[in-house]
Amino acid sequence: MSGGLFIDGVWRAGAGAQATSVDPTTGEVIWRQATASTAEVAAAVEAARKAFPAWADRSREERIAVLRRYKDVLVARTGTFAEALSRETGKALWETKAELGSMAGKVEASIKAYDERTGEHANDMAFGRAVLRHRAHGVMAVLGPFNFPGHLPNGHIVPALLAGDTVVFKPSEETPLAGQLLVEALEEAGVPAGVINLVQGGREVGQALIDQEIDGLLFTGSAAAGAFFRRHFADRPDVILALELGGNNPLVVWDAGDPEAVAALIVQSAFITTGQRCSCARRLIVSDDAAGRAVIDAVAALSERLVIGPWNGGQEPFMGPLISDRAAAMALAGAKAMPGQTLRAMTSVDGLSRAFVSPGLVDVTGETVPDEELFAPLLQVRRVGSFEEAIAAANATRYGLSAGLVSNETAHWDRFLTRIRAGVVNWNRPTTGAAGTMPFGGLGNSGNHRPSAYYAADYCAYPVASFEAENVTNTLGDIKGLRA
């Protein structure tokens, strides 16, 4: 490999500015390459356009065979790939190994979803048959995030390739190495030249990509970026947009019993991945009584026990660093500006890099808090007087990605399920729960009604209805109002 770009089956050095990727745990530079120029972005899209007809014409079985080889490559490379992800993101090795498992598992889940949701179905008709088929859109641009730099773009790329689309992939500028390793695995699996292309860079490269004649944009990231893309493509109804955005996710605890058991679910909802999951709980809503206070105390106590440290340190951590020193500085500033009573302060962590922060807990009861996603381990607590107030507080957001209820009362769950506005709703499970066999997406500022995961098949192909008779028959008698 002689460069950080992969265009038309060839690795090449970029003509843009130099870029680096830094291990947030140590500050060490672990990747250094030149980014893509506008001309190279255009070349990547042209390569994908040129490769599209032949790839789309391949049989389903041929495309499946390539993707199953890709799965095998991922399995074989799990150890080295997971370590690279841990170095680039700071995430614990148990997390990055799980991420590799999800990437490999995506292949079979996508095959099943494609056949179930976008396969071919026929019905007999008096004249012959009516057939539903699905066709690939063409060239898909995939913009990846930093928090799951393998799994989340993989969740777009695999179903797109399976459907017959070709792809130009731009990873997050925070995690270029992860994107490179993903494309290397596809290359080893035998994906034909031009079917997958990789361009590296920041916002200017992303802008150059969406300015091209693409057929779809598959994006995972912030609500602000999603709003920008909607405006950008307002006059391009031909471009399929699949936007998986953030959340200001509520977790309601009501009549839940053991505070320690409840606290374990809350911590796994709010502080896993150092709060850098779009489905992390940001708002904890509890009863304003002794039971609610016991839950709050249990969360604060359990938070003190969480191991915060490097992925390759002496003790396995629950939390690693945030993605960068800059992200940590923004998180600390956001925590400081949060109104209310600080129950556990978010702070820097002594003896570790500036990217490490501790989990924070703030009681915001009675306060007006901006409806924003703070991508960090900071949990707001709000105490309310009734379960109906709890549901109202949970729904008091423009977002609608994930929500959860912790309760031993089935009646509460039934009520919560019918009233909550979210695309992922969990009962006595962390808000971060998801599965490749289910859709994943949200309402409001959290998406555009094109959920990913199992429903990714829907936005990777479009339906074609055909009405077919094998022979020409004389239908003259069917014409009404015909002169003799």
Curated annotation (Swiss-Prot):
Keywords: Arginine metabolism, NAD, Oxidoreductase. PROSITE patterns: ALDEHYDE_DEHYDR_CYS, ALDEHYDE_DEHYDR_GLU. It holds the Pfam family Aldedh. The keyword ATP-binding does not apply. NAD(+) binds at residues 221-226. The active site is at residues 244, 278. Pathway: Amino-acid degradation; L-arginine degradation via AST pathway; L-glutamate and succinate from L-arginine: step 4/5. It catalyses: N-succinyl-L-glutamate 5-semialdehyde + NAD(+) + H2O = N-succinyl-L-glutamate + NADH + 2 H(+). Its EC number is 1.2.1.71. The keyword Oxidoreductase applies. GO terms for biological process: arginine catabolic process to glutamate; arginine catabolic process to succinate. It is an enzyme of class 1 (oxidoreductase). One of its GO terms (molecular function) is succinylglutamate-semialdehyde dehydrogenase activity. NCBIfam families: arg_catab_astD, PRK09457.1. Catalyzes the NAD-dependent reduction of succinylglutamate semialdehyde into succinylglutamate. Belongs to the aldehyde dehydrogenase family. AstD subfamily. This is N-succinylglutamate 5-semialdehyde dehydrogenase. The lineage of its organism: Bacteria, Pseudomonadati, Pseudomonadota, Alphaproteobacteria, Caulobacterales. The gene is astD.
